[in-house]
Amino acid sequence: HAGHIPDKETGSRAVPIYQTTSYVFKDTEEAAALYNMEVGGHLYSRISNPTVSALEQRIAALEGGASAIACSSGMAAMHLVVTALCSSGDHIVASSKMYGANINLLQHTMPRFGVETDFVNPNDLEAIEKAIKPNTKMIFGEVIGNPGLDIMDVPAVAEICKKNRVPLVLDATFNTPFLMQPFN
């Protein structure tokens, strides 16, 4: 039940599924404030809705994070984080022992947008640190590598990231928040 407060009116523990695509605004000022991202709220279900917000709040609570963004797939999440952190001319240091689709995204798709990646052994801390460049925007790895089940030393890599002021992005698909909370 993490991250969810039961409905005050009904006492329901379950979150209703909101089957709407659009929302009513009090006035044009409220609509303008929402569209300008000056206030929080729902504009259109493709962007957000109360059902997805409940999921995001629960995931954030389980992971120990401040907030979360729900994506339609793991690769959508990966693409979202890469494009949020990187622009043309930027660089990524990534694990060489990870899910093939992640490697394909970084090795074949992102170079078309001017983002280069160096792949390193996730257990070679010296290689990770040496691969960092002035334009490195993230270090990416999997807590438990897919398919080889390689275990990344997350605390050690996090220290390298802190020292170099580079975000550590982790794919935790193979483990649950019960076993690993990367924020901790």
Regions found by a protein language model. Give the residues of each.
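Residues at alpha-helix termini
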Residues: T10, L62-E63, F113, N164
